[in-house]
Swiss-Prot record:
Keyword Metal-binding applies: yes
Keywords linked to the UniProt accession: Cell inner membrane, Cell membrane, Hydrolase, Membrane, Metal-binding, Metalloprotease, Protease, Transmembrane, Transmembrane helix, Zinc
TM spans (from-to): 4-24, 33-53, 154-174, 195-215
The encoding gene: htpX
Cofactor note text: Binds 1 zinc ion per subunit.
Class of this enzyme: hydrolase
Organism of this sequence: Shewanella halifaxensis (strain HAW-EB4)
Location within or outside the cell: Cell inner membrane
GO CC terms: plasma membrane
Co-factor(s): Zn(2+)
Name of the protein: Protease HtpX
Family, as annotated: Belongs to the peptidase M48B family.
Length: 287
């Protein structure tokens, strides 16, 4: 839940700044056309900027150490395994990195299939068997091959646009209703209007998070299927079972955990970016 509230708070700050900037620029957001342009620019713009800098952000945020020259047999095996799987999946070799964390996790990020980063935690690298790590790597390579970074960015852009547009349309309706019942016809006033927009942004933002999480869970099942093809179904099941027995994740930011192997648990499954590990194992066994 903390991840969701943090995401909503960040979006609220962005929308507040966006509203001020658009007012300074004189963009009329009182009409449907102007409002839609405003919503699309900031809805998709923010999502694609995040995608464009995703590799850089991942390296800085997680302290990823990209392997350029393997220092030992473990790193050499890691790079060779990703290279083999990338060739099988028909994509350009991603950058391979390690980040220091005791959690059992890995993630993929990057602006495109042929410009990606696959990173694993030190806890996973030295706490799982080679077969299990191979399956985890195959899962991340499948995310890249499936174009999940771009897909989730497009979905995020659409729901961002919906949140910005819908919140201001509803706020406008409320403002007009208040004005029609006000002798002076002034409506809510600037500060009250902004407060209403803020609350509506939060409410619609929660709905948007549920939608994005739903599509993220679907992509996880697809990545599991892809990993089963690249590394073998039994290896993937064993890897998920090992993750199920490990400690709960907590170090990875939400922007990267959506394409990680092991997602954070939530009180509400609707807000989870990953299906429960038990369901993922059951889906693989049934396939």
């Amino acid at each position: 839940m903390k991840r969701i509230f943090l995401l909503i708070a960040t979006n609220m700050a962005i929308l507040l700044v966006a509203s001020i900037v658009m007012s300074i620029l004189g963009v009329n957001t009182s009409t449907m056309g102007g409002l839609l342009v405003f919503a699309a620019i900031f809805g998709f713009g923010g999502a694609f900027i995040s995608l464009a800098i995703s590799k850089w952000m991942a390296k800085k945020t997680m302290g990823c150490e990209v392997i350029t020259t393997p220092r030992d047999n473990t790193e050499r095996w890691l790079v060779e395994t990703v290279a083999r799987q990338a060739e099988q999946a028909g994509i350009k070799m991603p950058e391979v990195a390690i980040y220091q964390s005791p959690e059992l996790n890995a993630f993929a990020t990057g602006p495109s299939k042929n410009n990606a980063l696959v990173a694993v935690s030190s806890g996973l690298l030295y706490g799982m068997s080679q077969d299990e790590i191979e399956a985890v790597l195959a899962h991340e390579v499948s995310h890249v091959a499936n174009g999940d970074m771009v897909t989730l960015t497009l979905i995020q852009g659409v729901v961002n646009t919906f949140v910005i547009f819908a919140a201001r349309v509803v706020a406008g309706i409320i403002n007009n209703f208040v004005a029609s019942n006000d002798e002076e016809g002034e409506g809510l006033g600037m500060f009250a209007y902004m407060a209403v927009v803020f609350v509506l942004d939060m409410l619609f933002g929660i709905l948007a998070s549920i939608i994005v999480a739903y599509f993220s869970r679907i992509r996880e099942y697809r990545a599991d299927e892809g990993a089963a093809r690249l590394a073998g179904k039994e290896k993937m099941i064993a890897a998920l079972d090992r993750l199920r027995q490990g400690p709960e994740t907590g170090a990875m930011p939400a922007s990267m955990s959506a394409l990680g192997i092991n997602g954070k648990k939530s009180m509400a499954e609707l807000l989870m970016s990953h299906p429960p590990l038990e369901k993922r194992i059951a889906a693989l066994r049934a396939s």
